[in-house]
């Protein structure tokens, strides 16, 4: 079809000579028809970007036009999870997309889904592969094209705050992802100019440190490590394509009280206790990690304590000298580590800003309805030493912090943990435990109005449909263990039985009905 013919059909549509204009692979972008007030979608859309472009054909203001009606006849196709992704601008976080689906408006626009379409989209959200390399590569190329250079995580964050962690965790770290994409862009029949030559090689230890930063610092769940590193590193702004490399050197040691003040000042809602600070230091000096994780993250401390006569308690902290030397001598490593740190700080600020906007109060370091991995929970409980998931099992008591997180993989059956109501759960202990076992003696000690001051039992629940993700919803803390009784249940073989303690966990507050339905569905 010639441009003249196309313009003529558009004119007829605007002037009312045509009621509908059907297009295939046309009008996705670069077409401005403000008068359009109805969009009918008749085939599946495999890209959230194209979906948004198609939707945008009807979003321009026009005299006497009060709304646009979107009739979507293909809401049952496999990728229909892209509909809320396109509408609400989230492309990297399944749970945020689910929450967005509950929203009725975006700015001045209102959105509604019929119940069947909503149910199908929710099912699609459960099965969608959010880390599909093809989709992530498309998003990387989009930002790269707009910037004309290698996009850093801060650039990805500005494009879509939900994407940095998804992209960085697709490979060992974000530098590894970038290197793989730049190599890919330089190959194939549609090869493009590549910026691979801007990336210096990094050592195995440097790569492992970037991996640790991507896993622990980038999500921004706790500000302590981020603030401590920001204070000690004093990174300057620099880019891979800078003509003249920036000079960087490690700063002077900073006292413990000064670092604590910085955390409390920038994040007053956070837990500024010595327990959390010491836990963060143990992460940064690597004494927190188990042997396998320590090796996986490079076995290289980032900070170290030094004696200082000029500080209040004689303790100060500085960057580990070997780590500081890595930062000073390898520009690529320094830029990507600093970028991960900045993006983690941006994510952390978002978490605290969103909590304040929703008038949410942190329960110790946890936010209701947010998802956490088992590793996240151990760290945020303030433990000085992590444990293996096998040792944690369904729960683990840490007497030093008086915390005992409970983890439930929800699949209701006769011999499984099960919600009895929005505030109570039938809960089976580990095998072989009795009401006289240490964790139950601890839980039943000091029962009374002040029990919560000496006991913190956060409850985390994982949906069976989300098991591959490995994360649990925080549903609140347990206020009481009601009626613990010794009982039995079938063993793993199904041929015998094992002793367990059955008790009723009573939450401090009922679970929100929407989240409750989501968990038990």
Residue ranges and their predicted role:
Residues 1-28:
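Conserved helicase ATPase core of P-loop NTP-dependent helicases/translocases
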Residues 21-36, 56-58:
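SF2 helicase motor core recognition
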Residues 44-53, 57-90:
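Conserved segment of the helicase C-terminal RecA-like domain
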Residues 86-232, 239-244:
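Long, largely alpha-helical accessory region at the distal end of helicase-like NTP-driven motors
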Residues 194-388:
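C-terminal accessory/interaction regions of large nucleic acid-associated machines
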Residues 208-217, 232-233, 250-256, 260, ...:
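Acidic, glycine-rich low-complexity segments with interspersed aromatic residues
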Residues 466-521:
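Compact mixed alphabeta submodule
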């Amino acid at each position: 079809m010639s441009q003249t013919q196309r313009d003529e059909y558009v004119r007829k549509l605007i002037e009312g000579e045509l009621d509908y204009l059907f297009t295939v692979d046309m009008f996705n972008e670069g077409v401005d028809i403000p008068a359009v007030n109805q969009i009918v979608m008749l085939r599946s859309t495999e890209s959230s970007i194209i979906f948004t472009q198609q939707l945008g054909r009807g979003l321009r203001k026009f005299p006497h036009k009060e709304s646009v009606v979107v009739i979507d006849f293909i809401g049952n196709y496999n990728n229909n999870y892209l509909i809320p992704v396109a509408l609400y601008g989230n492309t990297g976080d399944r749970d945020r997309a689910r929450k967005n689906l509950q929203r009725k408006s975006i700015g001045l626009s209102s959105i509604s889904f019929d119940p069947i379409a909503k149910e199908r989209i929710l099912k699609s959200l459960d099965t969608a592969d959010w880390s599909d390399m093809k989709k992530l590569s498309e998003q990387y190329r989009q930002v790269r094209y707009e910037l004309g250079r290698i996009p850093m995580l801060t650039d990805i964050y500005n494009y879509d705050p939900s994407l940095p962690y998804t992209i960085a965790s697709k490979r060992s770290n974000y530098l590894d992802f970038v290197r793989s994409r730049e190599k890919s862009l330089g190959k194939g029949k549609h090869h493009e100019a590549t910026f691979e030559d801007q990336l210096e090689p990094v050592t195995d230890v440097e790569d492992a440190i970037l991996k640790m930063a991507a896993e622990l610092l980038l999500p921004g769940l706790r500000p302590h490590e981020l603030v401590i590193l920001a204070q000690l590193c004093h990174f300057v702004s620099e880019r891979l394509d800078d003509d003249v490399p920036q000079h960087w050197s490690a700063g002077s040691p900073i006292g413990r009280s000064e670092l604590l003040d910085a955390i409390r000042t920038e994040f007053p809602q956070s837990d500024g206790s010595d327990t959390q600070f010491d836990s963060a230091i143990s992460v940064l000096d690597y004494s927190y990690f188990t042997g396998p994780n320590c090796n996986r993250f490079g076995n290289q401390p980032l900070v170290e304590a030094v004696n200082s006569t000029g500080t209040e308690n004689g303790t100060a902290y500085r960057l580990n000298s070997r780590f500081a030397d890595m930062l000073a001598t390898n520009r690529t490593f320094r830029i990507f580590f600093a970028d991960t740190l900045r993006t983690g700080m941006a994510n952390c600020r978002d978490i605290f800003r969103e909590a304040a906007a929703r008038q949410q109060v942190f329960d110790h370091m946890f936010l209701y309805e947010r998802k956490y991995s088992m590793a996240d929970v151990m760290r945020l409980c303030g433990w000085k030493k992590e444990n293996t998931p096998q040792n944690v099992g369904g729960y683990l008591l840490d007497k030093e912090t008086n915390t005992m997180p409970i983890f439930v993989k929800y699949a209701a059956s006769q011999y499984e943990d099960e919600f009895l109501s929005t505030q109570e759960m039938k809960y089976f202990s580990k095998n072989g435990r009795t009401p006289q076992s240490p964790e139950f003696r601890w839980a039943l000690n000091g029962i009374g109005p002040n029990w919560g001051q000496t006991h913190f039992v956060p409850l985390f629940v994982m949906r069976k449909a989300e098991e591959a993700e490995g994360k649990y919803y925080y549903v609140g803390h347990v206020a009481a263990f009601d009626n613990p009784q010794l009982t039995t249940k079938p063993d793993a073989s199904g041929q015998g039985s094992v002793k367990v303690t059955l008790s009723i966990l009573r939450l401090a507050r009922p679970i929100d009905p929407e989240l409750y339905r989501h968990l038990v569905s």
